[in-house]
Each structure stands twice: as C-alpha cells, then as structure tokens.
Amino acid sequence: MEKRYQQLFKGKRIDFPLATGAASHVSLTYDEKKNPYLLCWTYIYQEKPEFTVPLKGCRIINNITEIGPCIHIITSNEEYQFQCRSKEEFDEMSQFFNMLGYPILGFKNVYVLNKKIGKGSFSTAYIGTNILYGNRVVVKEVDKSKVKESNVYTEIEVLRKVMHKYIIKLISAYEQEGFVYLVLEYLKGGELFEYLNNNGPYTEQVAKKAMKRVLIALEALHSNGVVHRDLKMENLMLENPNDPSSLKIIDFGLASFLNSPSMNMRCGSPGYVAPEILKCASYGTKVDIFSLGVILFNILCGYPPFRGNNVKEIFKKNMRCHISFNTKHWINKSESVKEIILWMCCKNPDDRCTALQALGHQWFLPKLTDMHMTANINELKRNEAIVHKSNDQQDMCKKCKHFNNTQNDDIYNNNNNNNQLDPNKNHKNNYNDYKNYFDTMLKIDDKYSENLIKDKTSMDSISLNKKDYDAYLVHSNEHDTVVLHGKCQTTKNSSSLLSYKCSRRSPPQN
C-alpha cells in the first residue's frame, strides 16, 4: 500500500484536514520556479482548491490538540494547523515534509524555559520565550505519566473551543520527550490575589468593571457547556498591571464539559466551593457563579466571607452560606452590590443567578443622576420622543418620532404616529432637544459611546418621558452593543421599565 507522502508526490489528493475544518484534503503542486504549494480542498472531488499554502520559507512545528498530534505550518502571512488522527499518520506526514526540505520543529526548537513560577500536583509552570519571535509566554509542563489525572487534554479542548478576550489564550500545545507543554499568553499584571494583598480592596466602581469582564467570560464558557470548577482569587489574573479591572480567567485544570462523567467529581477550593458540591449533590454551571460571588465579596472588603482557623471550619461556614455585611468595610457600599452578592451566593442553586442574569442586575446599570438630567428634561417639557430601531447614531436621530399627549408607560411602535422629526423642518427644536438628551446619556461612559459608533448599534423602541425618569445605558454583553433603557414613574408607588431586554428578576434572600 502506498504511503501518504508517496501519493502526494504523485499529485494525488489525500485526507489531511485542517483543525478548523476549513479544508479536508490536500495535494502537492509546484509553481514555475519549482516552489512547493499545498492545495487545500473541502472535499476530494472539488474542481478548484479553496486556497493554497505556500511552503517556501515556512516553519513547520509539531503541535497537539485534544484529538491528537498535528502539524502547524507558519508561513509569512498565515498559520495553518493540520490534524493527524494517529501517531503513524503524523510520522508519515513528518517524513513528507522532511523530504521536501522542511523538518518538523519540536517544542524545544521554538521555546526556551526561563523561570519556574509555580508547581502543582500534576504540572509545573514557567515563564518562557519564543526563540523565533522573542515574545514572552507562560508554559505549563505536564509529565505524560500524569496526563490522565492532570486533565490536560480537556484543558486544551476547552481553551481551543472557547477563545474569548477575557479568557487566557492558548497559543499552542506540544508533546515532546515525555512531557505535554501548553504555551499560554503571558499576562503582565499578576494574580488578583497578589494585587489585593499589595494594594488593598477595590473601589465599588473598579470591582464592577472587573466583575463584568469575568461574568462575560463565564457566560461564554457556560453557553458552550463548560464549567471552570475552580474559580478563585489565584485563578484570575490582571492583563494590565495598571488596570485592576483587567481580569482574565486562567487555569482550566479542573474544567469540565457538562456532559462529561467528570462532572460527578467533588472539586474546588475551600471557601469558594458551592454548597451543592460539598453536599455531593449534582451540580452545573452555577457553581462558578457562587465562587465569583465569594471573590466579589473579597475584593470589596479585603477578606473572604467564610473565614476559619482551619480548613474544616472554613468548609463548615462555606456549607452554611451565611454572608454578613456587619463590619465597617461595608458601611459605604451600595445596597445593590450586597444584593447581587447574596444572589450569586444563594445556598440553593435554583435561586442563584446565572452569569447573564447577574449582568442584568441593577448594580451593573449606570444611572443618570438629577444633575445629568434636569436641563434636558426641562427642555423636553410636554413632549415625548421615541427611539426606533436604526443602524447608527445619526440614522437613529433622523428616524426619531415625536408625539403629544401620550401615556407615561407606553411603548409606541404603531404605524399611526409617523411624524418624522426632520431637523430642517418644523420639528427642528424637538430634534435638537432629543439629540442633546441622547448625547448627554452617552457621556455617562465613553465605552458605550465608542461601541455605538463603531458597532453601528441598533436601538430598541422606548418612550422617553420628562416625569420622574431614570435613564440607563447598558452594555449588551453578548453582542457588544448598546441598549437604552428607561424607567417611568407611572403612579406614586409603581413604575414601568420601558425595555424589551431589561426585565430584572428580584434576587431571593438567603
């Protein structure tokens, strides 16, 4: 039987898929200068290749994924990772590239280990340097004899499946000389635990930004069926040493997919573990929310909610789930942050919020004060403006509709009221009033304004009323958009939240 490399040298197509799934077959060809190219096909009988990979001047590296060994080709413009399904297939393809004059590089041909920074039960962590480019990385070294216990292949799978800006990036993974190496991005800011020890508690505003990042990352993990299971201060790192809110989630050594048998395992760190894990009950993604609630408590006051003289005492308090705010550290903290901590740390997981529900809590909604609102409310007088769906800020203002004698809590979407606010016609003053009003709201947070312009955000219809009006700008964390929300006082004792996307469930009390 012909070897795979023999088939390639005869111009035949062989199955050699890209790890991304963008191509399934390759063949070999040469240009007029005899430079070799790989032609990449999505299926074997395709007439024209999807794309070509120039091999002249490339580097070829031996990587691994959770499936097995792979061949990583780095050209001057792109990188391509081809998946091998067995060691025999990898050996054959390695021979092919060697015969072409492109030997396979291993981990030690690409990286050098500089400094040991940590050691766990199954792995050792180093700061390393990429020899080819000079950039710093973090390398996690796992002895192959401990691969099963270390969960390293699940860690690789999780980091490849859920690539997110608030989760540490897996650059590559290798097998060489009895070890598995994970090459990860280097985060300059250090551990959250160290930062808190050196600098003291966070302000509530900084904590809010930090928690939003982590919740967004957790939502990405949970929506992909992944549970971290060991969220703690040491497993959050600062991306930027000058920005304490720039947190990223690291260390997926205990992570699991929801449908995995490993979800029966009892795991976590004392003081951070959800009570359902301690009770040996079934559990899901909400164990991460509990752990993050503990972290939020900790970064605001400088000490954990479940303290004890020994591990047994900590676990006992951890199981009981009683959280107290009766110290001087909590005197000036808002009621809403205490409320969200209690919601995140509910003993019963059915009463505990999800990541998405937490992001919708009022603590994350920046509120306009009377100082921001008074002038514009007076300008609006008896008039109300309606924001209708549009593609960007300019277009949105042009499509703004104007009404008289409307009810405070109505959302208008009917076709009977269609007087356009045209800045060049009779409604010029109303148009300018509204535009100034909206500009004022955008100034609450520069990030929201930037996202609106950059992302050409569409807006939900909403009534803007002068009477007892609270306005909010909310960052929609799923899609990086901006959503405008308003609350109108309809009677003395009630109000209506005028938005399709911001109905909020009141968290239960423990």
From Swiss-Prot:
Catalytic reaction list: L-seryl-[protein] + ATP = O-phospho-L-seryl-[protein] + ADP + H(+); L-threonyl-[protein] + ATP = O-phospho-L-threonyl-[protein] + ADP + H(+)
Keyword Kinase carried by entry: yes
Enzyme class (EC, first level): transferase
Highest taxon in the source lineage: Eukaryota
CDD domains in alphabetical order: STKc_CAMK
InterPro entries: CDPK_Ser/Thr_kinases (IPR050205), Kinase-like_dom_sf (IPR011009), Prot_kinase_dom (IPR000719), Protein_kinase_ATP_BS (IPR017441), Ser/Thr_kinase_AS (IPR008271)
GO molecular function: ATP binding; protein serine kinase activity; protein serine/threonine kinase activity
Localization, UniProt: Membrane
Keyword annotations of the record: ATP-binding, Kinase, Membrane, Nucleotide-binding, Serine/threonine-protein kinase, Transferase
Active-site residue list: 230
Segments of this protein annotated with the region Disordered: 408-428
Enzyme Commission code: 2.7.11.1
Pfam families membership: Pkinase
Keyword Manganese: no
Ranges of residues in domain Protein kinase: 111-364
Recorded GO CC terms: membrane
Sequence positions that bind ATP: 117-125, 140
Entries under PROSITE patterns matching the protein: PROTEIN_KINASE_ATP, PROTEIN_KINASE_DOM, PROTEIN_KINASE_ST
SUPFAM superfamilies: Protein kinase-like (PK-like) (SSF56112)
Record's protein name: Probable serine/threonine-protein kinase 2
Organism encoding this protein: Plasmodium falciparum (isolate K1 / Thailand)
